[in-house]
Amino acid sequence: MRDIRELLLVLFTSCLALGSVPSSFDGDRYCRCQPGEACWPSLADWQALNMSIQGTLVEVRPIGHVCHEPTYNKADCERVSKLSSNGTWRASQPGAQQEHAWEVSLSRNESCYVGPANPAEPCGQGRIPRYSAMVETTEQAQKAIRFARERRLRLVIKNTGHDSGGRSSAVDSFQILTQRLKDISFIEEFTPTLAETRGPSVRIGAGVLTKELYAVADEHGYTAMGGECATVGVAGGYIQGGGVSTALTPMMGLAADLVQEFEVISAEGSLVIANEFQNQDLFWALRGGGGGTVGLVTSITMPVFGAIPANISELSFESQQPDEAFWTAVKEMIYVTRDITTGGNSGQYWVGRGPTGSYFVRQTLFFLGETDIEPADKMGSLLRVLQDQEIAFRFNVTAYPRLSSFLAIPQGEFVGGIAFHQENILIPQGFYDSPEGPAQLVDRLAEVKLNPGDMWVANTLGGQVMANKDVDNAMHSGWRTASVLLVGNRIFEPALKSQLDVQERLTAVEGPLLHSIGQPAPEAIYLNEADADLENWQDWFWGEKYARLRDIKSKWDPDDLFLVRHGVGSEDWDEDGMCRMQLSPQECPVREHSRCTCKFFECAMLHVPGLL
């Protein structure tokens, strides 16, 4: 019996020595270190880290804590309340996300809302990190990553906090904030490491916002690829999740198709270059595999383009009720958009309810490379329908010698702090381009009850996205046959019950309806704007490419230091990414040790020779 015990001890200690399991063991599962546990860093440990990263470490409280006792301060609460809608400010705050939903913790019933409505209500930490390394250099980020790895901490990466899936926050976590990595440099003839020149490109730090990139690119006479919202970080989850540009994607493709090189810090704290000539597997995974999953990206390099002339048309109309006349006009608007957005032209349309309850439609079309076109001529049928239905509308066209000057005008800069959930679907070309496609789409959408503030937003795809079918990256193959990305935004009150109610509505009611569009084969779902409780997310986000992503993550991050909600490998962990899910004894030592989460003695009894 003594020999057996010694053998068990050897097996147990050797498993720990591999360094591939978190250090806390609760009898059933291996967990990361949490506050209050012996393994949690001491104050001296945090102070030592702070000194090593030049004083950029801060202890974090939710931004709303100044509006709650015992730290209530009337003046500070008023100041934070005024700043709360500023997306740029929220991006810079370690204690904030862009969306309320991912500042609170439903599992712990913790929230800390901004505003003086109820100062006596306690402020819970929620999903806001305990500490943040607000790094200013790559070297500081490397030290922070090594610290998190050695201390077995729940690590989160926040770029700007634009994240509808909860990937930028986690309970009891240690955050690395990349907002201060702001370098932008243009390269006339970019040469990827170990490669030939590729033409004009831009290298940007992880903290560069869309509005910052667009403004500097315009100053240099370039057009850059980025998203619509001014306060999104281009090099973060935007490009690593795919990267849709409202104006440029049909002409140029997805941002993940274009990116030429990543500088990334690995789970071991090493700075590596990933491009098509070195670390090709990492390069493949970073282009569509999702942000914060296989490493911390410190900079990217991507091509820039010359001046692109553009005529941009904007049309909008409203209706007090969603009657037949309203939906008739919506159908014609989609037919016209579909017919116009070919040959590199692009478009976006919104259908929703305003704060007062009225229904609205907004359409923006980008006629790119065409200077002598008359958009009104292209939209004649829609304008006639609006007149026939006696619907008042606003329509204007603006010509821009350079699209970049339009992009440099910040969009959506003051929409931070909104409480909303998202859902989306990629609509396949076969459905959308059919004679009845737009009409059937509107009939489906009309079934959904919209509350004030709710809306549908559609971006046209196709074009170069489809033409890039041979680009080898982690993007779901469904992108190559999709015509439209349709996104639903659903507003809720800043209260946990309201948040839960809206989430249940999305997942149980609206989700199945969305998934039915284009049946029997809907294409895919965009991971950057997805239902937070989506089932089978691996298939919807990546399809047949998920297995390869798992393999690459196991190679580069076997301990899952980089873990995000509904990200590669997260199914092995609990909801908060704190403890590994328990596997059956049969699965344990048969799989790699980093997945060994079953009860130790059950594993030993199965796999120690002669024990049974």
Swiss-Prot record:
Specify whether Oxidoreductase is a keyword of the entry.
yes
Q: Which PANTHER family match?
A: BINDING OXIDOREDUCTASE, PUTATIVE (AFU_ORTHOLOGUE AFUA_1G17690)-RELATED, FAD-BINDING PCMH-TYPE DOMAIN-CONTAINING PROTEIN
**Single GO molecular function:** FAD binding
Pathway membership? Alkaloid biosynthesis
Name the enzyme group at the top EC level: oxidoreductase
Q: List the lineage, top down.
A: Eukaryota, Fungi, Dikarya, Ascomycota, Pezizomycotina
Q: What is this protein called?
A: FAD-linked oxidoreductase notD'
Per its Swiss-Prot or TrEMBL entry, what cofactor is needed?
Answer: FAD
Please name the source species: Aspergillus versicolor
Q: Name the Pfam families for this protein.
A: BBE (PF08031), FAD_binding_4 (PF01565)
Keyword annotations for this protein, in alphabetical order, are:
Alkaloid metabolism, FAD, Flavoprotein, Glycoprotein, Oxidoreductase, Signal
Q: Which domain of life is it from?
A: Eukaryota
Please state the Enzyme Commission number of this protein: 1.-.-.-
